[in-house]
Amino acid sequence: MRPTVLCFSGLDPSGGAGLQADIEAIGQSGAHAAIACTALTIQNSQQVFGFEATSKELLLAQANAVVGDLPIKCVKSGMLGTTDNIAALAEFLRAHPDYQYVLDPVLVANSGGSLGDQATLVKAFVELIPLATLITPNTVELRALTGVTDLDQATQKLFEMGAKAVLVKGGHEDTPDFIKNSLYIDGELAASSTCPRLEGEYHGSGCSLASFIAGRLALGDSLKIAVQHAETWLFGVLKNAETPVLNGQKIPKRF
């Protein structure tokens, strides 16, 4: 059986982000996706209306059900929603130190809607940061996690908090013509990439990127190669994104 990525994330009814994005991106990477649902969200491509989080007990039961049954090589997390779920994931990862782990530190949806109490989640994420093979914050999340405005200083603060590798995504920066991503490993810049900035906004781009990276890691790629493959794939997916009927954020066309 193909190597498996176990995804801890929420269910998005629009199919643009969350678990559906994870499943599609991991499938396109060549790996198999298993899921542990952290929350049922009420959202579309325009906004988040609310969510109901899974209990810690149910979340761990989902994850433990597939351990041993599937060849899990990597864990990926997106929306976790509550501090209990963050604690549950940390407990799971400590029980399985051989799993690689990609942490996408989701605090709000791309549409701006809340996916949990941000201040509380930021404090709880401290427990996950040292457990991650790679953390994939956008610049808004990076500043929120560290409390530091300068991006270079914020990145170094993450390493002081125990990070091993960080992919800083520049899509939220004021660069009208391009987007720059920077990969840091052990506190040093390991690679950077730029791509043209596409028009519009996209629902689930961050989920897709982190999940594709996780899939490639599960298949044995190095961190630098996994990120390179994922960035190339994502740009094509976003170029072909589809616009919803009510003109919300575009849905990446992942297959």
Curated annotation (Swiss-Prot):
How does it get modified post-translation?
Crystals show a disulfide bond between Cys-195 and Cys-207. This disulfide is possibly an artifact of the purification and crystallization conditions. However, as it is adjacent to the conserved GSGC of the oxyanion hole, this disulfide may help to orient the backbone amides toward the oxanion intermediate.
Which pathway features in its UniProt record?
A: Cofactor biosynthesis; thiamine diphosphate biosynthesis
Positions annotated to bind 4-amino-5-hydroxymethyl-2-methylpyrimidine: Q43
Record-level GO BP terms: thiamine biosynthetic process; thiamine diphosphate biosynthetic process
Q: GO CC: one term?
A: cytosol
Q: What is its EC number?
A: 2.7.1.49
InterPro entries documented for this protein: HMP/HMP-P_kinase_dom (IPR004399), PM/HMP-P_kinase-1 (IPR013749), Ribokinase-like (IPR029056)
**Gene Ontology molecular-function annotations:** ATP binding; hydroxymethylpyrimidine kinase activity; phosphomethylpyrimidine kinase activity
Q: What class of enzyme is it?
A: transferase
Q: Which UniProt keywords apply?
A: ATP-binding, Disulfide bond, Kinase, Nucleotide-binding, Thiamine biosynthesis, Transferase
**Any inhibitors or activators noted?**
Inhibited by pyridoxal phosphate at high micromolar concentrations.
One protein family per Pfam: Phos_pyr_kin
Residues that, per the record, bind pyridoxal 5'-phosphate: G18, Q43, N110, S208
What exactly does this protein do?
Catalyzes the phosphorylation of hydroxymethylpyrimidine (HMP) to hydroxymethylpyrimidine phosphate (HMP-P). Unlike other HMPKs, it cannot catalyze the phosphorylation of HMP-P to generate the diphosphate HMP-PP. Shows no activity with pyridoxal, pyridoxamine or pyridoxine. Does not show phosphatase activity.
Q: Which family does it belong to?
A: Belongs to the ThiD family.
Q: What is this protein called?
A: Hydroxylmethylpyrimidine kinase
Native organism:
Acinetobacter baumannii (strain IS-123)
